[in-house]
């Protein structure tokens, strides 16, 4: 075992407001330690203290003299980690980081840096869980290095977990909602509707996925109450899979914060294929503050802006985390350019299915101009999709080589297929169904049960927010009725852009009684897990003889012939065009 010299005197450093690091009650020495040599490893900067045990998880978290990480809750044997916090698991909790080495990387008055290392024996993933405390910061930074040289399946998820004292932290916060979640111990006594879903005594439905949210909309999430808050801040989304439409479970009952740096609850990319067989996830910041409920949220919002402005972190000393970054700019030209979502990612694969590399995204302005800051050096494809209007075709421009402090791509032409006449359109092309009825509500599976089996939507009379729903979720017919002043010849195109599917739905599409397409999809679990706006995007451009349309009244029917429980199709937009 290597051990260096003691780099600080604990008493003097604490008095100066710096970081102290003690191992088994004595000033810590940098080096590698067997778990059996670690009884307690404590980091303290006067604002916060945290102690880790021999398995690499935390045994204590103290702010202002208050212990925040005791009385941890969960259901055993259902959750074998019910009494642990600050740890990593994967494959739906079926695998976890096992500490082979606890490394004290750096011990200075400015920083304590430790790493819990799993060498990957017995078919486990080789993992490094790095945890850092900086002087003057009431929180902990972290990152994970995962090695996967043989491209093994990650089982759909890998995450860091932060369990807190539920007696203190009885409120949950994500971008979409705040609320008091029930305790697992109470939930297991109730009627279970489906997995992780219960009927409450008042008849309402609670599902842990009610507290999912989009990473692109959620700069922080966590728990708070009784004078304290703990908020997880991703700081950057570059290391998450699936891009701007990636949504994940972030917090749930028993005061648990979940950082799914690999997650596919809604069909997004699992990210199994890492470049060179290794990927660094993070760094992130877990902020611990104090105050009343409103104060801790307001303070955390200010803090996350401060942390984002520091990116990339100059104190990071990892070859896998380049500090030299590039600002990539340009201007899209084309029908879908205004306010388009612009991304740099791998070529050849829809961004939502990516995860092994890094993804950068920003929304363009009204003129199509975009700026992507802090991009890692490398070769990317430029991807874009519309967030308004009628353009459903995506842009991909390959071989974008990023280097230097800035890269101006100039004008990027976005050529989209267009037809001579748009007869009608329902919704806007943004890969989401949020503009339709219930699409703006808080997540809950009750909404999919409230959509009608049959409806008639009349072009020119019906309203999207009132008469078209976020999803079609029952066997029945959704009819679009419209008048045409004339008959047509040639080719017509019905575009059905789908924001998500659940429950293996089957839909037969017909025009004036003539079937033109039968759709059948696999499950992305979006509506099943209370999503209201998106899952896996799909696009159908269905051509048919324009002669099927007549002068007078016409009907396009979306006939659902089969769907699983709480499943359905979420429509992004539906439009009819003539060549």
Which residues does each PLM region occupy?
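Acidic-aromatic substrate-binding/catalytic surfaces of carbohydrate-active enzymes
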Residues: 37-101
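Extended, loop-rich substrate-binding clefts of extracytoplasmic carbohydrate-active enzymes
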Residues: 81-147
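Acidic (Asp/Glu-rich), glycine- and aromatic
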Residues: 131-132, 136-183
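A short, amphipathic beta-strand motif
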Residues: 326-334, 368-370, 412
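Short, acidic Ser/Thr/Gly-rich low-complexity loop/linker segments typical of extracellular
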Residues: 350-369
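A short, solvent-exposed beta-strand micro-motif common in secreted/extracellular proteins
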Residues: 368, 378-389
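Structured interaction patches on ligand/partner-binding surfaces of diverse proteins
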Residues: 387-411, 415
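Beta-strand-rich ligand-recognition modules
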Residues: 475, 481-489, 497-579
């Amino acid at each position: 075992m290597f051990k260096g010299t003691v780099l600080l005197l604990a008493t003097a450093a604490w008095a100066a407001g710096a970081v102290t690091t003690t191992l088994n009650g004595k000033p810590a020495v940098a080096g590698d330690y067997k778990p059996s040599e670690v009884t307690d490893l404590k980091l303290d900067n006067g604002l916060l203290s945290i102690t880790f045990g021999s398995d690499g998880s935390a045994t204590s978290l103290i702010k202002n003299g208050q212990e925040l990480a005791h009385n941890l809750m969960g259901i055993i044997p259902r959750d074998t980690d019910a009494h642990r916090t600050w740890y990593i698991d994967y494959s739906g909790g079926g695998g976890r980081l096992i500490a082979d080495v606890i490394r004290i990387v750096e011990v200075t008055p400015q920083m304590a840096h430790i790493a819990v290392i799993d060498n990957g024996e017995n078919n486990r993933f080789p993992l490094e869980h790095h945890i850092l405390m900086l002087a003057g910061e009431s929180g902990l930074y972290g990152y994970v290095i995962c090695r996967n040289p043989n491209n093994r399946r990650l089982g759909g998820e890998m995450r860091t977990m932060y369990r807190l004292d539920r007696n203190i932290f009885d409120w949950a916060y994500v971008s979409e909602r705040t609320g008091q979640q029930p305790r697992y111990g109470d939930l297991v006594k109730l009627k279970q509707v489906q997995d992780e879903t219960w009927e409450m005594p008042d008849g309402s439905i609670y599902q842990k996925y009610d507290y999912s949210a989009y990473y692109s909309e959620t700069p922080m999430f966590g728990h708070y109450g009784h004078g304290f808050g703990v908020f997880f801040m991703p700081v950057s989304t570059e290391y998450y899979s699936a891009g701007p439409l990636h949504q994940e479970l972030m917090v749930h009952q028993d005061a648990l914060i979940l950082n799914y740096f690999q997650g596919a609850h809604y069909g997004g990319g699992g990210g199994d294929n890492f470049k060179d067989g290794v990927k660094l996830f993070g760094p992130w910041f877990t902020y611990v503050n104090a105050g009343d409920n409103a104060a801790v949220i307001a303070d955390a919002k200010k803090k996350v802006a401060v942390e984002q402005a520091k990116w990339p972190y100059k104190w990071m000393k990892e070859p896998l985390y380049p500090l030299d970054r590039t600002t990539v700019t340009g201007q899209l030209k084309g029908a879908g350019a205004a306010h388009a979502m612009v991304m740099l990612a791998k070529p050849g694969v829809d961004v939502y299915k990516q995860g092994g590399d890094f993804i950068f995204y920003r929304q363009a302005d009204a003129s199509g101009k975009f700026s992507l800051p802090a991009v890692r050096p490398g070769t990317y494809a430029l991807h874009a999709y519309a967030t308004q209007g009628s353009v459903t075709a995506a842009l991909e421009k390959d071989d974008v080589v990023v280097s230097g402090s800035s890269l101006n791509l100039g004008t990027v032409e976005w050529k989209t297929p267009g037809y001579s006449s748009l007869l009608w359109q329902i919704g806007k092309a943004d890969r989401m169904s949020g503009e339709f009825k219930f699409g703006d509500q808080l997540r809950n599976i009750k909404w999919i049960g409230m959509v009608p089996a049959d409806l008639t939507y009349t072009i020119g009379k019906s309203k999207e927010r009132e008469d078209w729903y976020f999803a079609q979720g029952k066997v029945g017919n959704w009819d679009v009725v419209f008048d045409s002043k004339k008959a047509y010849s040639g080719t017509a195109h019905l575009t059905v852009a789908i924001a998500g599917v659940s429950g293996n739905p089957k839909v037969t599409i017909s025009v004036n009684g003539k079937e033109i397409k039968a759709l059948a999809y696999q499950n992305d679990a979006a509506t099943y897990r209370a999503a209201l706006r998106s899952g896996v995007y799909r696009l159908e451009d269905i051509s048919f003889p324009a002669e099927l349309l007549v002068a007078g009244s016409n009907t396009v029917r979306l006939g659902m012939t089969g769907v699983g429980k709480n499943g359905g199709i979420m429509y992004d937009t539906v439009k009819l065009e003539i060549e």
